[in-house]
């Protein structure tokens, strides 16, 4: 009797192997053979799931979009604004979550490398722009629910810039972590000065 293979699970295993490869060397230097080896399969077997590296990268960008959207929504759904003394405290708590991933949350940390690829590959670039559009829309909805509709697209986009910058700095180990519990408060200090 033939073994039944969960194709989606295999694809996810390959995407996670791709992510591990990217932690070892730049995305443009990672080959399908590297990924297959990391996934514990042959190169021809990997090609049953992804026809080429671009298809794999596009799937990774899609995975990233879905992951970020889902986790952002979950954070806001499980953290009531009423539990915090102010909007500033609430948004600082969210940014602390962004800066300090909870243990066991396997974030797609190679996302920042795909942002660069998007500049050189139109299809990947389009997918990344769609990722940001969806993510911004989700953020706008979350912010509107907190601020009773007084917040719009611009504030959501500002949060996207802040979140993306935090991810990029974390990926490179550039943050000290000393301000992770008051990121927005420190930005507010600039506006008040």
Model-identified regions with their sequence ranges:
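Amphipathic alpha-helical packing segments from all-alpha helical-bundle domains
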Residues: 103-112, 119-147, 157
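Residues in soluble alpha-helical coiled-coils and helical-bundle/repeat scaffolds
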Residues: 5, 51-55, 81, 99-103, ...
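Hydrophobic alpha-helical connector segments
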Residues: 59, 73-105, 156-159, 181
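Solvent-exposed, amphipathic alpha-helical segments
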Residues: 13, 17-24, 71-74, 110, ...
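N-terminal intrinsically disordered/low-complexity leader segments
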Residues: 1-9
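Short, basic, alpha-helical segments at the C-terminal edge of helix-turn-helix-like DNA-binding modules
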Residues: 62-69
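Helix-turn-helix
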Residues: 13, 17, 21-55, 59
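Hydrophobic/aromatic-rich alpha-helical bundle segments in the mid-to-C-terminal region
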Residues: 125-129, 145-191
């Amino acid at each position: 009797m033939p073994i039944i293979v969960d194709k989606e699970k295999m694809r996810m295993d390959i995407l996670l192997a791709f992510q591990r490869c990217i932690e070892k060397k730049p995305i443009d230097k990672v080959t399908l053979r590297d990924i297959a080896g990391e996934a514990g399969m042959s190169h021809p077997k990997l090609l049953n799931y992804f026809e080429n590296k671009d298809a794999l990268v596009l799937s990774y960008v899609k995975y990233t979009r879905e992951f970020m959207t889902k986790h952002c929504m979950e954070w806001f759904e499980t953290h009531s604004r009423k539990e915090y003394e102010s909007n500033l405290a609430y948004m600082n708590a969210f940014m602390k979550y962004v800066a300090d991933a909870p243990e066991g949350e396997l974030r797609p940390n190679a996302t920042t490398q795909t942002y660069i690829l998007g500049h050189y590959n139109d299809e990947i670039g389009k997918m990344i722009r769609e990722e940001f559009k969806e993510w911004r829309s989700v953020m706008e909805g979350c912010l509107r629910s907190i601020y009773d509709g007084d917040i719009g697209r611009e504030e959501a986009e500002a949060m996207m810039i802040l979140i993306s910058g935090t991810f990029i700095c974390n990926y490179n180990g550039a943050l000290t972590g000393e301000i992770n519990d008051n990121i927005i408060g420190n930005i507010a200090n600039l506006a008040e000065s």
